[in-house]
UniProtKB/Swiss-Prot annotation:
It is found in: Cytoplasm. It catalyses: tRNA(Ile) + L-isoleucine + ATP = L-isoleucyl-tRNA(Ile) + AMP + diphosphate. GO terms for cellular component: cytosol. One of its GO terms (biological process) is isoleucyl-tRNA aminoacylation. A motif ('HIGH' region) lies at residues 58-68. InterPro entries: aa-tRNA-synth_I_CS, aa-tRNA-synth_Ia, Anticodon_Ile_BEm, Ile-tRNA-ligase, Ile-tRNA-ligase_type1, Ile-tRNA_ligase, M/V/L/I-tRNA-synth_anticd-bd, Rossmann-like_a/b/a_fold. Catalyzes the attachment of isoleucine to tRNA(Ile). As IleRS can inadvertently accommodate and process structurally similar amino acids such as valine, to avoid such errors it has two additional distinct tRNA(Ile)-dependent editing activities. One activity is designated as 'pretransfer' editing and involves the hydrolysis of activated Val-AMP. The other activity is designated 'posttransfer' editing and involves deacylation of mischarged Val-tRNA(Ile). This is Isoleucine--tRNA ligase. The gene is ileS. L-isoleucyl-5'-AMP binds at E567. It comes from Pseudomonas putida (strain GB-1). ATP binds at K611. Zn(2+) binds at C906, C909, C926, C929.
Length: 943
């Protein structure tokens, strides 16, 4: 028996079936580094239009987690796809380096006894060490960027750039000093930004407190009475007993009705709507003797329960009837609304009582409670209120309360002298900042679109931005204040530039060691040099200034400096927010054209990632077991606009999908064996009809994918590429061409046409997957035939695809109908295999009973229909001749019948044909194979 295997064009490639990504990816990284891939991209892109994705800096602390990996991979997919689309898309990674978490780490490691200078030195060392660790992890994910020259907010140039950005805002009149309640953490000893506040349940003691009336006559008149027959008091309700010593006013709503209630021993003023619930709470009976509009009670004085001072009634719209008494006690130093209302009524800063120190302890001079920590003083305050007869009721409740994101301890609002960026302050020219920012939001594209309303609401309702902190490890606010007037030095902007130049050379340490006389000369004795540092959100919020137009200078020169900012949804109140404010203050527009927001990672049950739950996924572990390309494929396959589920099981599914894509690539490469595009590539008009369709289908898909990439719809890219590999290629085209590819002459038109199509598909596919499967695409690139440059990334989308010409007889619609027929035939072949009527598809002969239109369509393929259906014989008969046993199909006008072939099997092509054995020299094969071996070779036109 002759072995005909050697006469076949069997697939052959060195491209490995087993990916071995954990071992192979580091080798590919080394190759990218050795060829200077990132630098080469900058060289070839210098004359291209620019696309700037600006990296929101992760904090330089700890190992990266799955959220970091998700974020960086998304950014990399965009940068790579924009590069392939013909843009110069530089990517400069960055790190946020200053701030409390690093200072806290240093204190924990080295103790709190350190000098400020030593603290800064150790913080700088710690941040540098953390950056190196994170950098290695990010590079391992395949993220392409300027890793040798990242930006760091602690680099001297960037620290100086922040000071210059602040100087611009000072010059334009946005910065002011004010006493104002800010989020205050006792453990940090500093104000916190809104983004550093989180909410958690807290148990609080609520109290209802009676404030005796001081103006009896006015109160009686307000209620339409000649006089008060009994002592009277107004009752407040609060969850913060510790603020009672700082009470300076009482707030009621101007439009609510208030009742004067006779409870027997005294009269109580309560919101009319809440009288019943209040009396029940106080275990009292009473009756309403008069009512008055809230506005009628304005400026009536009541007495503080245990201090000799008055508390006037101020009207305020923020008073609610949801709980309490309808009366709010006002401690302007410890409540934002209280502060605003008291200021509106003319209270000046010097009048505001601030008995709570930065560590949460009352000043020693405070009567009754001096020297006590506020949370521990609550019982003593309640006891004092009870002692003076002012306590109406007390109970403990659990409610959502603000906590420090770092220490997880409760915060308070605390009025301190801080530096602010004014939201509604009139600048030297143009509109106030809030107005500018809201307009800029309208000019920004949001992905997903709901981000616009969210950021708009935050900007519309936010208070002035407190930019000062009382910490060591931060960029200084280099101000000199006049000792008598408290005013900024008249040459502040000029002095800030002098400081910036020093910081550029020596870092922030230059300010802290500076002797004021070096800059002020004889004036130095008249000025205080302040030691406040900038909020870290100012550090990252001004990177558009000190990075994109400073240390790295890659931004656009007109309009927004960056095309895209991309971060998690929490950054609407973080980096997106601070960048918008600084951009609008300095340039009068946002620093970005587009904002993309991604959701947070959760496990497969929708639970947050938590070490305590044991459901975290470590990127390093995934890299070392499955490979970074699997993580990248998971990112691409998941709609990032909501929560993104990830688990070992989900990643395993991604690994399965990866194998299907890799196997498709391997099939393509193995069937390009012996193909040299310079020698063997056929022109479209010389190719077989099915091959031309395959190239046309590839072109149509590429157009779709380019659009999905440009709109950042990576999950659509993934699903379409995966379906193309599994269905249109694996389930249709690649199966059909095997016979032609393996059995026809090695240099025949039939085979070279097929290889030409496979080559075009491969060139397109390797580029499609390059932004997602960065490592695998570059690996495939090395195995493709023909001369090529060193990396797939040094190219654009493939331009060698051709469209089916207008008026082509076997057009797209035609092949869609053929695919539908083939699907129906496959279904019946499967049934016959299951029933053991046939062993394999080639053992089948199929008769298609088709209506006139379908019959004409199928007839166009002639004898080549059997190759499309992958059966040994296929015939088309009029639909009316279908016997009773013919099987109905889902295709209209089609029935079919499958029978087992009665012929012998060809030992070479495995078709069952009547002419097997008809050639005496080759008794084991069919005449078609004989012709392909020793004759002129078979001629194919269609498939």
């Amino acid at each position: 028996m002759t072995d005909y295997k050697a006469t076949l064009n069997l697939p052959d490639t060195a491209f490995p079936m087993k990916a071995g990504l954990p071992q192979r990816e580091p080798q590919i990284l080394q190759r990218w580094d050795s060829i200077g891939l990132y630098q080469k991209l900058r060289e070839i892109g210098k004359d291209r239009p620019k696309f700037v994705l600006h990296d929101g800096p992760p904090y330089a602390n700890g190992k990266i987690h799955i959220g970091h990996a998700l974020n960086k991979i998304l950014k990399d997919m965009i940068v790579r796809s924009k590069t392939l689309a013909g843009f110069d898309a530089p990517y400069v990674p960055g790190w946020d380096c200053h701030g409390l978490p690093i200072e806290h780490k240093v204190e924990v490691t080295h103790g709190k006894h350190l000098s400020a200078d030593r603290t800064r030195e150790l913080c700088r060392e710690y941040a540098a060490e953390q950056i190196e660790g994170q950098k290695t992890e990010f590079i391992r994910l395949g993220v392409l960027g300027d890793w040798d020259n990242p930006y760091k907010t602690m680099n001297f140039a960037n620290e100086a750039g922040e000071i210059r950005a602040l100087a611009e805002m000072v010059k334009q009149g946005f910065v002011f000093k004010g006493l104002k309640p800010v989020n205050w953490c006792f453990d940090c000893g500093s104000a916190l930004a809104e983004a550093e506040v989180e909410y958690a349940d807290k148990k609080s003691q609520t109290i209802d407190v009676a404030f005796p009336v001081a103006d009896e006559t006015k109160l009686a008149a307000a209620f339409g009475l000649a006089s008060l027959a009994k002592p009277a008091a107004i009752v407040i309700w609060t969850t913060t007993p510790w603020t009672i010593p700082a009470n300076q006013a009482l707030n009621i709503h101007p439009e609510f009705k208030y009742a004067l209630v006779d409870t027997g021993e005294r009269l109580l003023v309560l919101a009319e709507e809440l009288v019943e619930s209040c009396l029940k709470r106080y275990n009292l009976e009473g009756s309403i003797i008069a009512t008055a509009q809230g506005s009628a009670l304005e400026l009536i004085n009541f007495r503080h329960p245990f201090y000799d001072r008055l508390s006037p009634i101020y009207l305020a719209d923020y008073v609610e009837l949801g709980a309490g008494t309808g009366v709010v006690h006002s401690a302007p130093a410890y409540g934002e609304d209280d502060f605003v209302t008291c200021k509106r009524y003319g209270m000046v800063n010097d009048d505001i009582l601030t008995p709570v120190q930065s560590n949460g302890v009352y000043v020693e001079s405070l009567p009754f409670f001096g020297g006590q920590f506020i949370w521990k003083a609550n019982p003593a305050i309640v006891e004092k209120l009870s002692e003076v007869g002012a306590l109406m009721h007390t109970e403990t409740i659990s409610h959502s309360y603000m906590h420090c994101w770092r220490h997880k301890t409760p915060l308070i609002y605390r009025a301190t002298a801080q530096w602010f960026v004014g939201m509604d302050k009139q600048p030297t020219t143009g509109e106030p900042l809030r107005e500018r920012a809201l307009k800029a939001i309208e000019d920004t594209k949001f992905v997903p679109a709901w981000g616009q309303a969210r950021l708009h609401s935050m900007i519309a309702n936010r208070p002035d931005w407190c930019i000062s902190r009382q910490r060591n490890w931060g960029v200084p606010i280099p101000f000199f204040l006049h000792k008598q007037t408290g005013e900024l030095h008249p040459r502040t902007v000029e002095l800030m530039e002098q400081v910036a130049k020093r910081v550029e050379q020596e870092g922030i340490e230059a300010w802290f060691k500076l002797d004021a006389a070096e800059l002020l000369g004889v004036e130095a004795d008249q000025y205080d040099k302040i030691t406040d540092t900038l909020d870290v959100w100012f550090d990252s919020g001004t990177t558009h200034w000190h990075v994109l137009r400073g240390s790295h200078d890659i931004g656009h020169t007109t309009g927004p400096v960056a095309d895209l900012y991309l971060e998690g949804s929490d950054q609407h109140r973080g980096w997106f927010h601070s960048s918008l404010l600084t951009g609008c203050a300095i340039d009068n527009h946002a620093p970005y054209r587009e904002l993309l927001t991604h959701g947070f990672t959760v496990d497969e049950n929708g639970r947050k990632m938590s070490k305590s739950l044991g459901n975290t996924i470590e990127p390093e572990k995934v890299n070392n077991t499955l490979g970074a390309d699997i993580l990248r494929l998971w990112v691409s396959a998941t709609d990032y606009s909501g929560e993104m589920a990830v688990s070992e099981q989900i990643l395993q599914r991604s690994a399965d999908a990866y194998r299907r894509i890799r196997n498709t690539a391997r099939f393509l490469l193995s069937n390009l064996s012996g193909f040299d595009p310079a020698r063997d590539l056929l022109a479209p008009e010389d190719m077989l009809a099915l091959d031309r369709w395959a190239v046309d289908r590839t072109l149509l898909l590429q157009r779709e994918l380019e659009e999905h990439y440009s709109e950042y719809r990576f999950w659509n890219v993934y699903s379409k590429v995966h379906n193309f590999c599994v269905q249109e290629l694996g389930g249709f085209y690649l199966d059909i061409i095997k016979d032609r590819q393996y059995t026809t002459g090695a240099n025949s038109v039939a085979r070279r046409s097929c290889q030409t199509a496979l080559y075009h598909i491969s060139e397109a596919l390797v580029r499609w997957i390059a932004p997602i499967l960065a490592f695998t695409a570059d690996e495939i690139w090395q195995y493709l035939p023909g001369e090529r440059n060193e990396s797939v990334m040094l190219n654009g989308w493939y331009q060698g695809l051709s469209e089916l010409p207008e008026g082509t007889e076997l057009d797209r619609a035609y092949w869609d109908r053929v695919m539908a027929v083939k699907a129906s035939v496959n279904k019946e072949l499967e049934n016959q295999r299951t029933a053991k009527v046939i062993g394999g598809n080639l053992q089948a002969e199929v008769t298609l009973y088709a209506d006139e239109g379908l019959s004409a369509d199928l007839g166009k393929l002639g004898d080549e229909l059997r190759f499309v259906l992958i059966t040994s014989a296929a015939s088309v008969v009029p639909f009316a001749q279908a016997p009773a046993e013919a099987v109905a199909t889902e295709v209209e006008g089609l029935k079919l019948k499958v029978v087992k072939s009665g012929h012998a099997k060809c030992g070479r092509c495995w078709h069952f044909r009547a002419d097997v054995g008809s050639h005496p020299e080759h008794p084991e094969i069919c005449s078609r194979c004989v012709d392909n071996l020793s004759g002129s070779g078979e001629v194919r036109h269609y498939a």
